[in-house]
UniProtKB/Swiss-Prot annotation:
It is a multi-pass membrane protein. The lineage of its organism: Eukaryota, Metazoa, Chordata, Craniata, Vertebrata. The chain crosses the membrane at residues 34-54, 78-99, 114-134, 179-199, 227-247, 289-309, 321-341, 348-368. Component of the ubiquinol-cytochrome c reductase complex (complex III or cytochrome b-c1 complex) that is part of the mitochondrial respiratory chain. The b-c1 complex mediates electron transfer from ubiquinol to cytochrome c. Contributes to the generation of a proton gradient across the mitochondrial membrane that is then used for ATP synthesis. It holds the Pfam family Cytochrome_B. This is Cytochrome b. Belongs to the cytochrome b family.
């Protein structure tokens, strides 16, 4: 009898257990597609980024010109840049949907995989931020100035920390060079942590929409879910192609077509759309240090969610009250995103403050209390 190399070779065996013979719950829906879509996004971003890095120069006098050169003179440079810029937006869409799926179906109770996922989100945000600075346009420069300046809010070490990150007394060549180094390095750190994320996930197996143990009803990942995931791949690639070819600047800021000028401040400084919800929370607190802490907590609050789970049921599928609160949270995040892009004036300030309080209240108080109340209603003491 011939041995199957897929099951015996020490290296191929690892891939086989992760992608081919992986026991998967038979009832997982399309919402479980986003993990593999994120893997595809990461591969697309690393490949396009590598080709951009071959032509980009991390120097303040030539950075903007090198991006123009990529778009005008490099073979398909315009396409590579458009895919990379819009690929970042799709990456964040997939990340937010992936997190929303985890929140809805109680996947956060796999604490190790969940916490690694939150760290991955933080690294992804850091990568996107330093990447946005690289074209050295107006919004790149002023966005970097505003966000790095926030560190000066920390008592005693703040100013020293800012100058340490800048590499001088203002944002200059040293800043751009190190941001390019970080932008090149961090995706590979993300790849490493993704493997650890998968390792922890495969220790427990996937969750499913019912939130129940599915050990008695598992099917192999390939061919069932590998083909199901291909549908998501095609849809995402079509969407990315449509964005990159027809509406490449839809999600960007027109201000970034102007070369960076330290003497002229743009009328409205705002980050890319995927940071606007956190930016709105930052702006809604009048105190600088309070705003910075709220900004950080708006992301790291996700790490507290496993500890705040009070319901005896894992998934939201049979919990109508918590379902309502989940969709309230989604609507609230959309409102925060809209507010983050508006000027700092009334009524946007008040709406932002209400939405920020609601955001933290839902996570910390309302949803845990509702879970406890549902247990009482169902006599699940």
């Amino acid at each position: 009898m011939t041995t199957n190399i897929r099951k015996t070779h020490p290296l191929i065996k690892i891939v086989n257990h992760a992608l081919v013979d992986l026991p998967s719950p038979s009832n997982i829906s399309i919402w479980w597609n986003f993990g593999s879509l994120l893997g595809l996004c990461l591969i697309i971003q690393i490949l396009t980024g590598l080709f951009l890095a071959m032509h980009y120069t991390a120097d303040i006098s030539t950075a903007f010109s090198s991006v123009v050169h990529i778009c005008r003179d490099v073979n398909y440079g315009w396409l590579i840049r458009n895919i990379h810029a819009n690929g970042a937006s799709l990456f964040f869409i997939c990340v937010y949907l992936h997190i929303a799926r985890g929140l809805y179906y109680g996947s956060y109770l796999f604490k190790e995989a969940w916490n690694i996922g939150v760290i991955l989100l933080f690294l992804l945000m850091a990568t996107a931020f330093v990447g946005y600075v690289l074209p050295w346009g107006q919004m790149s420069f002023w966005g970097a100035t505003v966000i790095t300046n926030l560190l000066s809010a920390f008592p005693y070490i703040g100013d020293m920390l800012v100058q340490w990150i800048w590499g001088g007394f203002s944002i200059d060549n040293a800043t751009l060079t190190r941001f390019f180094a970080f932008h090149f390095l961090l995706p590979f750190l993300i790849v490493g942590l993704t493997l650890i994320h998968l390792l922890f996930l495969h220790e427990t197996g996937s969750n499913n929409p019912m939130g129940l143990n599915s050990d008695m009803d598992k099917i192999s990942f390939h061919p069932y879910f590998s083909y199901k995931d291909l549908l998501g791949f095609f849809l995402m690639i079509i969407l990315l192609a449509l964005l990159a070819l027809f509406l490449p600047n839809l999600l960007g800021d027109a201000e970034n077509f102007i070369p960076a000028n330290p003497l002229v401040t743009p009328p409205h400084i705002k980050p890319e759309w995927y940071f606007l919800f956190a930016y709105a929370i930052l702006r809604s607190i009048p105190n600088k240090l309070g705003g910075v802490l709220a900004l950080l907590f708006s992301i790291f609050i996700l790490m507290l969610i496993p500890m705040l789970h009070t319901s005896k049921q894992r998934s939201n599928i049979f919990r109508p009250m918590t379902q309502f609160l989940f969709w309230t949270l989604v609507a609230n995040a959309i409102i925060l995103t809209w507010i983050g892009g508006q000027p700092v004036e009334q009524p946007f300030i008040l709406v932002g403050q209400i939405a920020s309080v609601t955001y933290f209240s839902l996570f910390l108080i309302i949803i845990p209390l509702t879970g406890w109340w549902e247990n009482k209603m169902l006599n699940l003491n």
